[in-house]
Swiss-Prot record:
<keyword id="KW-0963">Cytoplasm</keyword>
<keyword id="KW-0808">Transferase</keyword>
<keyword id="KW-0276">Fatty acid metabolism</keyword>
<keyword id="KW-0460">Magnesium</keyword>
<keyword id="KW-0275">Fatty acid biosynthesis</keyword>
<dbReference type="Pfam" id="PF01648">
    <property type="entry name" value="ACPS"/>
</dbReference>
<dbReference type="GO" id="GO:0006633">
    <property type="term" value="P:fatty acid biosynthetic process"/>
</dbReference>
<protein>
    <recommendedName>
        <fullName>Holo-[acyl-carrier-protein] synthase</fullName>
        <ecNumber>2.7.8.7</ecNumber>
    </recommendedName>
</protein>
<dbReference type="GO" id="GO:0008897">
    <property type="term" value="F:holo-[acyl-carrier-protein] synthase activity"/>
</dbReference>
<dbReference type="InterPro" id="IPR002582">
    <property type="entry name" value="ACPS"/>
</dbReference>
<feature type="binding site">
    <location>
        <position position="50"/>
    </location>
    <ligand>
        <name>Mg(2+)</name>
    </ligand>
</feature>
<comment type="function">
    <text>Transfers the 4'-phosphopantetheine moiety from coenzyme A to a Ser of acyl-carrier-protein.</text>
</comment>
<keyword id="KW-0444">Lipid biosynthesis</keyword>
<comment type="similarity">
    <text>Belongs to the P-Pant transferase superfamily. AcpS family.</text>
</comment>
<feature type="binding site">
    <location>
        <position position="8"/>
    </location>
    <ligand>
        <name>Mg(2+)</name>
    </ligand>
</feature>
<dbReference type="InterPro" id="IPR004568">
    <property type="entry name" value="Ppantetheine-prot_Trfase_dom"/>
</dbReference>
<keyword id="KW-0479">Metal-binding</keyword>
Length: 118
């Protein structure tokens, strides 16, 4: 059963300028494992984090490091949740988080579907 859906888009050029103008932003938004990725990958991950927050219904108490995107052996993205976000997902009975990210034509986008078992 679908429990939530979220989508977000990020302008790559604007996001890149923001990271260049405010170097601390990279540290604030991304975990240590994510920070070394290229700007287009960071923008897609930021869009995915925003989409997950929308799917959960809000960002109260959420810290950006509570949401991390990792890739499996086949480079499929998946979330690692911590702290407040992990508790929110457990309280809502979220069994699966599906995430899709892409970037093209100067835009990064992400789509998240939250699923309960029944």
């Amino acid at each position: 059963m679908i429990a939530g859906i979220g989508v977000d888009v990020v302008d790559l050029a604007r996001f890149g300028r923001s990271l260049a103008r405010t170097p601390a932003l990279r540290d604030r938004l991304f975990t240590e494992a994510e920070r070394g990725l290229p700007v287009h990958s960071l923008a897609a991950r930021f869009a995915a984090k925003e989409a997950l927050i929308k799917a959960l219904g809000g960002s109260e108490g959420v810290r950006w490091h509570d949401l991390e995107i990792v890739s499996d052996e086949e480079r499929n993205p998946a979330f690692v949740l911590r702290n407040v976000v992990e508790r929110q997902a457990l309280e809502r009975g979220i069994a699966h988080i599906h995430v899709s990210m892409s970037h093209d034509a100067g835009i990064a986008t992400a789509f998240v579907v939250l699923e309960r078992d029944s």
